[in-house]
Amino acid sequence: MTGMNDNNAAIPQQTPRKHALSSKVMQLFRSGSRSSRQGKASSNIQPPSNINTNVPSASKSAKFGLHTPTTATPRVVSNPSNTAGVSKPGMYMPEYYQSASPSHSSSSASLNNHIDINTSKSSSAASLTSSVSALSLSPTSAINISSKSLSPKFSHHSNSNTAITPAPTPTASNINNVNKITNTSAPICGRFLVHKDGTHEHHLKNAKRQEKLSTMIKNMVGASKLRGEAKSAVPDIIMDPKTTLKSNKNPPTLFAGFMKQVVDMDDKYPEGAPTSGALNCPERDIYRSDQKDSKNNTHNITTTKKDRQCFAEKYGRCQEVLGKGAFGVVRICQKKNVSSQDGNKSEKLYAVKEFKRRTSESAEKYSKRLTSEFCISSSLHHTNIVTTLDLFQDAKGEYCEVMEYCAGGDLFTLVVAAGKLEYMEADCFFKQLIRGVVYMHEMGVCHRDLKPENLLLTHDGVLKITDFGNSECFKMAWEKNIHLSGGVCGSSPYIAPEEYIKEEFDPRPVDIWACGVIYMAMRTGRQLWSSAEKDDPFYMNYLKGRKEKGGYEPIESLKRARCRNVIYSMLDPVPYRRINGKQILNSEWGREIKCCHNGRALK
């Protein structure tokens, strides 16, 4: 006998011999089937087969990773049974990372409005009309960008004992929105998670969209042919970037400023010389107290054929390009079958920086430059500074530097892909940056080229300073007085004003100035100005605004008074009044910033 009626016609009466379902479970099953059919009968439009219509709208949104921005105030997740979002009670999640019942179609349409690097010129131009930087995404979209890191294939936090409701198969329209969440000890939602006690975690594995952006940036700073191909993806920016920047009422975005440097470099080097972070930097002696020994240092570098053959055994094979610049190329090196502590075999990755000799550079200056950079970087040992491992010569006679590999990419790409960072995430990176700068200054080293492109990130959010090609040793261990620096060094938006107007200056406030500009770039997604000179209207507006009661609008938008006061002090145009790194860390704002566990300073 089959119980056939209007509500359960498709559910036959089960016999105890075939099924062991209790009557209560069977009743719930029939009730769910009944409500499902009633929902279908009320609409002629069938939902996609991969969407569970019994899930409430808010839960459904969270399950598919469809986020809409609300407020940036953290709140407690009150539904511990929600396995699609944060599944444990007592976890904080910023509300701008939470879903607010968006429809599936509207979220897909919103995501389609974001620029894709592989789109045609016409579609790219249409997406770029509202902003000079068309690659900026909303803060919530930045969470979807990193969703690939949470898939079983790429996750570093997967658990074989995970028990969650199977997610529906993603369709072409929502493939970029699906967050595959696992029930780990620390539930993940996108790239940033805040716990109830105020601690947080970063998950910065690059996603496809971020990888495309990173590839385009590599091409931008590569040969002229590659730059031409990359420019085709952003025609509105390339059309007349100088006019665009001047006509815009807002300061230039990070990407627009980067594009301006690329175009300016094309004008300066029509043959397609690669760009560099160091602009108009004069030749100088890094180790002024040890100039005579710098030439002899090259004899300690690996040069024999036998040693070159040992490189593959020690560091593995070099593969894809990670970055390009005037110095040369950075490649990733993979060494397989590395024994781990648990006895299993794994792989280890390294970054290999290939030095290139400049056209107007003699062999002696070339050797001095690379050995000076290697000596400085290899002598610095800090959590927030990239570890330099080795210096050797390849088969072509080019010198190469081996460094640790940072899987999270660089801060520039992250900010451009996200549009801007919320304060908790930016504060964590900022405090790590200041810790690294304080350590450098204590060691008598000044970087002089701090910018988001030279700040690397691990997959778990540890910030590391890299590229010491322009760094200086301003004080040796046995010296009491510092050596003053001179010349203009670095990328123009981050160059301190004293570099333009003084022949000699203390290099330490120069790094602090750059850190202040970097923080504002993280929080606003824009550069404060093109250069800190009197002919720059944005810089002049800043000088005027900092003296007025209302302040300078971009800095005033930070809302927190403690933060604003420190940033104003870091960006003081008078160098000797500028706050130093230790004062930043000891300020009220500096003390209240909570770094992630992996970002805590370990010397």
UniProtKB/Swiss-Prot annotation:
Active site location: D449
Region spans: Disordered: 1-86, 150-171, 267-301
Regions of compositional bias (Polar residues) in chain numbering: 1-15, 30-60, 68-85
Pfam families: Pkinase
Positions of ATP binding: L322, G323, K324, G325, A326, F327, G328, V329, V330, K353
Similarity remark: Belongs to the protein kinase superfamily. Ser/Thr protein kinase family.
Protein name (database record): Serine/threonine-protein kinase HAL4/SAT4
Gene: SAT4
